[in-house]
Amino acid sequence: MLTLCAFLIVAAGNASAHHSFAPFDLTKEKTITGTVSKFEWTNPHSWVWVDVPNEKGGVDSWAVEGMSPNYLARRGWTKTTVKPGDKITISVRPLKSGENGGMFVRATLADGRVLTQSGQPTD
């Protein structure tokens, strides 16, 4: 019984850590504009990879973490909502580390569609 309790405590801690927002600065929002290089419709989280032109004339790759495909599908997304080659302006909660990445907030595609994860309309 003691072994089972210890296992459940460790498992609960790992599950909680998995869903942590700790890597992201939730007090800030950064907006980037670029071209989608890859969209990963995978569990447990979806990912949008965006190539963003930088000041030096090169390109920075940004990794943007989203919700699970199941969650997004219930809000109208499909695995082709975002495609490589799409022009996109995307807002994120940036990584605290300063690396090029963040947690998805909203995005606007070239055709004017606004994508959110909440299912709520945006301005």
Tell where the protein language model's regions lie, with residue ranges.
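Bacterial N-terminal signal peptides
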Residues: M1-G13
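OB-fold/S1-family single-stranded nucleic acid-binding modules
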Residues: L95-G119
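Short, structured beta-strand/loop micro-motifs enriched in basic residues and often containing a Trp
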Residues: G66-R74
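Short nucleic-acid-contacting surface segments enriched for D/E, G, S/T with interspersed K/R
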Residues: R74-T89
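Short aromatic-glycine-enriched beta-strand elements
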Residues: T42-P53
